A protein has these predicted regions:
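Phosphate-moiety recognition in structured ligand-binding domains
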Residues: 1-43, 126-134, 138-146, 170, ...
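Active-site phosphate/pyrophosphate-binding segments
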Residues: 20-30, 37-48, 53, 173-281
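Short, highly selective alpha-helical patches that border small-molecule cofactor pockets
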Residues: 28, 71, 75, 114, ...
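Glycine-rich phosphate-binding loops that contact phosphosugars or nucleotide phosphates
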Residues: 45, 52-194, 296
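Catalytic-loop motifs flanking and including active-site residues across diverse enzymes
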Residues: 70, 160-167, 231, 235, ...
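N-terminal beta-loop-helix "entrance" segment that forms/cooperates
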Residues: 73, 98, 257-266, 338
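Short helix-loop-beta junction
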Residues: 73-86, 237-246, 310-314
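A generic structural motif
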Residues: 85-91, 132, 245-257, 315-326
Length: 364
C-alpha cells in the first residue's frame, strides 16, 4: 500500500517550503542552468576534437543511477536515422578501439567498475566522453585520456539528468550525428520550471496537477513512441526515488501484450459505473491504475496513438509537442523535468522524500 499524500500541502506555500528543507524543488528547477553550464564545460573539455570522426560504434554506458535512463533516451533519439551502431551496456566491451566513441555518466566518483571500463577504453584508444565528479577513481581513470565534463552546478545525486543528457547530445552533435540547440533547450527547461514553480496553484501548475493524478494510483506509463517510452523509464526512476509508487513502463504495442494489465487499463479508462461503491469491492486493497499515454514525437497519424485513443478513451495523454514548439530532444527533456517535479511534489506531500532517506552514492 502506498503512502497517502497530504494534497493540501501542495498549495500551502509555507508548509511546502518547510517540507522541502533540502531545497530539492530548487535543485530540480536548475535543469536549464545545468544545460548552459554543461555547454560551457563541454567546450572546455575539447568535444570539438570529435568533429570529423566517423565512429564504428557509439557505446552508451548504463551505470547505476541516471545512467540507464540517459542512455536509453539518447539511443531512442538517435535510432530513427543514425547510421552508426548503438551499443547500450553496463560495462565498456573489450572490443572497443580507436574508431569507437564511449559516452558515460555517473554521480558516483567511486564506481570501481566504471573506472576500470574508462581506463580500458582509453588504453585501447577509444574516444571517451565522461560526465562525472572531478574527484575520485572514475575521474582519475579519465585523467589525460578521456574528455571529462565535471558538473559545474552543485545538485544532489540523481538531479543531474539535464547535465548527463546535454553532455551526450553535445558529443553527438560534434560527431555530426545529431542536431541540438542547447540554448533553446535551456530556455524551454527554464519555462517549464517556471510553470511548475511552487508558487503556482495546482490547477495552473502542470507538475502539481500530474502529482495529483498519480496520487494513490498505480501509474501505467505507456509510450506512443520510442522517445516517450524512454522518458517513461526516467519517470519511473524519479517516482521510485521520491515516492513509493510502483510504475509499469512500456511502449504501447508491448503494453497490449500484457493482457491482464491491459484489460485493467481498459476498464479504468472506459468510465465504468460512476455510482459503484468502492467498499463493495471484494478483494485485496489495491491502488487503481492510472494510464498515462506519453508522446514526444509529433506523429498524429501514428498507429499506436490512434489505437490507444480508441482503446483507452479516458487515458491521460501527455504530449509536450502540443504545448511548445520544440524539437524531440527538448520535448523529451521538458517531459522528464515535469515528471521529476511531480515526483518531488508527491514525495513531499506523502513524506517519502527529503532528509536522510535520499540516495547517496559511495564516496571515493
Amino acid at each position: 500500500m502506498t503512502s497517502l499524500p497530504d494534497d493540501s500541502l501542495l498549495d500551502d506555500i509555507a508548509r511546502l517550503i518547510d517540507a522541502d528543507r533540502d531545497g530539492l524543488l530548487r535543485s530540480a528547477a536548475l535543469a536549464g542552468a545545468q544545460v548552459r553550464a554543461t555547454t560551457d564545460a563541454a567546450a572546455e573539455a575539447g568535444l570539438d576534437r570529435l568533429s570529423g570522426l566517423r565512429p564504428r560504434a557509439i557505446v552508451l554506458v548504463t551505470r547505476p543511477g541516471l545512467g540507464p535512463s540517459v542512455s536509453h533516451l539518447i539511443a531512442a533519439l538517435l535510432q530513427p536515422s543514425c547510421a552508426v551502431p548503438l551499443v547500450v551496456c553496463d560495462q565498456v566491451p573489450n572490443w572497443v578501439g580507436p574508431l569507437d566513441v564511449v559516452l558515460a555518466h555517473t554521480d558516483d566518483p567511486g564506481d570501481v567498475v566504471l573506472a576500470e571500463s574508462i581506463h580500458r577504453a582509453s588504453r585501447f584508444g577509444a574516444n571517451v566522453v565522461l560526465t562525472a565528479p572531478e574527484e575520485g577513481p572514475v575521474a582519475a581513470a579519465a585523467a589525460g585520456q578521456a574528455m571529462l565534463i565535471a558538473p559545474r552546478l552543485v545538485v544532489p545525486p540523481g538531479f543531474g539528468f539535464a547535465t548527463a543528457v546535454t553532455s551526450g547530445l553535445l558529443a553527438l552533435r560534434a560527431l555530426g550525428l545529431f542536431s541540438v540547440d542547447a540554448a533553446a533547450l535551456a530556455d524551454e527547461l527554464d519555462k517549464e520550471a517556471e510553470r511548475d514553480h511552487m508558487q503556482h496553484e495546482s490547477f495552473v501548475n502542470p507538475a502539481k496537477a500530474l502529482a495529483l493524478r498519480l496520487a494513490e494510483h498505480t501509474p501505467l506509463l505507456w509510450g506512443l513512441d520510442h522517445v516517450a517510452t524512454a522518458v517513461g523509464r526516467y519517470a519511473a526512476q524519479v517516482l521510485a526515488t521520491h515516492t513509493d509508487l510502483v510504475c509499469d513502463v512500456a511502449g504501447y504495442q508491448q503494453a497490449m501484450s500484457r493482457t491482464a494489465l491491459h484489460r485493467a487499463a481498459v476498464r479504468a479508462t472506459s468510465g465504468g459505473d460512476i455510482f459503484a461503491d468502492p467498499d463493495d469491492f471484494d478483494g485485496p486493497a489495491a491502488s487503481p491504475p492510472r494510464v498515462l499515454l506519453l508522446a514526444v514525437r509529433s506523429m498524429p497519424g501514428d498507429a499506436s496513438r490512434l489505437l490507444a485513443a480508441e482503446t483507452l478513451p479516458g487515458a491521460d495523454l501527455i504530449a509536450p509537442a502540443e504545448e511548445i514548439s520544440a524539437d524531440d530532444a527538448t520535448c523529451a527533456a521538458v517531459l522528464a523535468l515535469r515528471f521529476e517535479l511531480a515526483a518531488l511534489y508527491l514525495g513531499l506531500a506523502a513524506g517519502t522524500t527529503g532528509g536522510t532517506g535520499r540516495y547517496a552514492p559511495a564516496t571515493a
